[in-house]
Amino acid sequence: MYKRQIHTTADFDYAQTLHFTPGAVAAGIAAMHAGATIITDTNMALAGITKPGLAKLGGQALCFMADPAVAAAAKQAGTTRAVAAMHKAAAEYPGAVLAVGNAPTALLTIAEKIENGLRPALVIGVPVGFVNVVESKERLFAVCESHGVPAIVAMGRKGGSNVAAAICNALIYSAAEMLDPTARGWK
């Protein structure tokens, strides 16, 4: 996991800032083996996920940010599309892997949903930036830990859609290699 993040970003800080709840990597690999649906908060993260490898495991990756219904729901509720997209993800794919690389508001929505009973297979929380990023990551990690929800979170200000995709790919490649050690990630 660390290797893929460092390779993706050329940033060795991920060896210290990437945090895992107990069993998070195993839960992520198990989700991939079970044909996970991965929901991202950006089309950029979606584009970075290896679709052939995920499809061979029976999974799919989706992003609702460009969904007209999500835009309408966000406008009606006076919130962001990221929040509305996570509401849709929770309603339609409650056991999905949620991969957030951009929107702290998405992390806060996921944390609230978990407190109200949502149990995603895994939450990947790696938004990048300055506004509410650190706080949203810390809250998400604490909520996931206290509710037994697997999570991988890049603490601090670093992260991004590329990091979210790289974590997803590390899980996909690990799952593929467990099924066939010669597969080398099924690229």
Name these PLM-found stretches.
Residues 54-93:
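Long, charge-dense
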Residues 92, 106-123, 127, 132-135, ...:
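Feature captures the catalytic cores and cofactor-binding loops of soluble hydro-lyases/lyases
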Residues 131-187:
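C-terminal functional extensions of proteins
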